[in-house]
Amino acid sequence: MTQAAAPAAHSSFYMAMRILPATRREAMFALYGFCRAVDDIADERGPATASQRLAELDRWRADVAGMFAGRAPTRLAALDQARRDFDLKQKDLDAVIDGMAMDAAEDIRAPDWATLDLYCDRVASAVGRLSVRIFGLAPEPGDALAHHLGRALQLTNILRDIDEDAAAGRLYLPREALAAAGVT
């Protein structure tokens, strides 16, 4: 198992990623490792305070910028190879960090639809845009697939995790939908 594969080994995605051709597989392992690392910062496994979590996400943002400037830090070596092999976009990696920052800054409670859509784009559709490049889809249909599938999967996750999120002080259901259902 490669170093990039290690974080994915305990994921439900691991077996699916293993069947990809080697270059695509290593790129997906690297992308998964990046997403897992920044997600861990934003949730309960991350630093204790919001300011500490945001500072750590800023370090990741600086490392991503350095990678695109030709100065990839060691922790992004595998992702840098994926970036070069598959033309991954900095804006999508930054969007993932921005989504985690939305979680890290404060507990999300009943955002409006626009904020929820932005959150879904950042934490799910951006990952989809990176993934479809690795899978080799053409940009236009690939980005459309990432847009819709990312949102569908993230909304499904929100519904699946509603109890867990509530225990953590988070509520991702949009306030307009709650109001329409008579929930205040």
Indicate residue ranges for each PLM-predicted region.
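Acidic catalytic motifs of isoprenoid enzymes
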Residues: 1-184
